[in-house]
């Protein structure tokens, strides 16, 4: 029986490293993009040649980063052509690209739509210029609105906007105003995340040395509740702890993660999971490129998930979603353990 699965591709290039971001990204390396694209194509071909993926039914592709919207459409089309040699592209329901307002030109947006990308995720983060500056974002609130309108004109009918709360000096009123302004745009999907202090980031350093004071847990919780309330009142369904969507506009790719479905991944730092094993690539562009030059996969390490690991992950992921834990799927994953009998006891 085939399993619905996703494909993730990581583009590490950025114009600036945001102080709160712990995803793998690099600046001042855009000259490496042509070589990077060729390496992604090589990784795809190598991976499919070395792995039996016949039981996986790929229906989503997610282009993340970094800043994928810095990549010219014809380069991304090369990647799609490589994938089409191994998968049935007619089965793909959703192709998402992450984009930063102010960095995705009208020409690029039109080009993305023409090559089959049907969903775009804008990293707004805030519509307050002061808070955007704190977050090291290069765009302004006005550029967010312009980028959204340009995407609509380019033909995107499925748009997500990422927002952040729990930002120092962000009041409940500012948060409410920002959310209502975003909702006026009527995106199909809104993600809203609490700003977390990740080790190794500039934000972590500034919080540790006292330069930045984070909001307390009570205010963080109030912001979360206000966000949920505003979204609900505006017709957005909260289907996961941080994600809100209009009817039938959930992010299909992210549902694969939360359902513990298989997904494969390409690019530096990318993580994949085939239903039994999880693996992750080297978190270095130079190492990634050099290993593929030797016709080897750039996998740093892997682990076999035990039944207990799968059980715990399905419970934790399920509790984040509105549908809760899928007992039938839990039974399938755990094999010998009959969850229904355990619950009755």
Regions found by a protein language model. Give the residues of each.
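Local cysteine-cluster metal-coordination motifs and their immediate loop/turn environment
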Residues: 12-23
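Cys/His-rich Zn2+-binding cysteine-cluster or related metal-binding knuckle/ribbon modules and their
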Residues: 54-55
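Short active-site neighborhood of thiol/selenol oxidoreductases, capturing the structured segment around
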Residues: 8-10
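Short amphipathic alpha-helical interaction segments
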Residues: 336-345
């Amino acid at each position: 029986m085939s399993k619905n699965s996703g494909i993730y591709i990581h583009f590490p290039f950025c114009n600036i490293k945001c102080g709160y971001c712990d995803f793998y990204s690099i600046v001042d390396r855009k000259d490496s993009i042509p070589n990077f694209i060729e390496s992604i194509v090589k990784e795809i071909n190598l991976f499919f040649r070395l792995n039996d993926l016949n039981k996986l039914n790929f229906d989503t592709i997610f282009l993340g980063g970094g800043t994928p919207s810095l990549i010219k459409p014809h380069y991304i089309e090369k990647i799609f052509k490589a994938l089409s040699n191994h998968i049935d592209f007619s089965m793909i329901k959703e192709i998402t690209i992450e984009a930063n307002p102010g960095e995705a030109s009208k020409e690029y947006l039109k080009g993305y739509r023409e090559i089959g990308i049907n969903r775009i995720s804008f990293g707004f983060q805030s519509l307050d210029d002061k808070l955007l500056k704190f977050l090291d974002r290069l765009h302004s609130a006005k550029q967010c609105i312009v980028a959204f309108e340009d995407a609509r004109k380019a033909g995107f009918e499925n748009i997500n906007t990422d927002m952040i709360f729990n930002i120092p000096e962000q009041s409940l009123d500012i948060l409410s105003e920002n959310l209502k302004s975003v909702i006026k745009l009527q995106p199909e999907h809104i993600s809203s995340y609490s700003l977390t202090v990740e080790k190794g980031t500039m934000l972590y350093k500034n919080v540790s040395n006292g330069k930045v004071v984070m909001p307390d847990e009570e205010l963080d919780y109030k912001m979360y509740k206000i966000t949920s309330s505003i979204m609900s009142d505006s017709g957005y369904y909260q289907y996961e702890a941080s994600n809100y969507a209009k009817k039938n506009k959930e992010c299909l790719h992210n549902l694969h993660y939360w359902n513990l479905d298989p997904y494969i991944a390409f690019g530096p730092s990318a993580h994949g999971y085939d239903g039994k094993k999880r693996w992750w690539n080297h978190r270095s562009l130079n190492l990634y490129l050099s290993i593929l030059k030797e016709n080897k996969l750039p996998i740093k390490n892997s682990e076999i998930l035990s039944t207990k690991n799968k059980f715990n992950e399905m419970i934790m992921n399920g509790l984040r979603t509105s549908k809760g834990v899928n007992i039938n799927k839990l039974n399938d994953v755990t094999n010998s353990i009959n969850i229904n009998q355990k619950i009755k006891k």
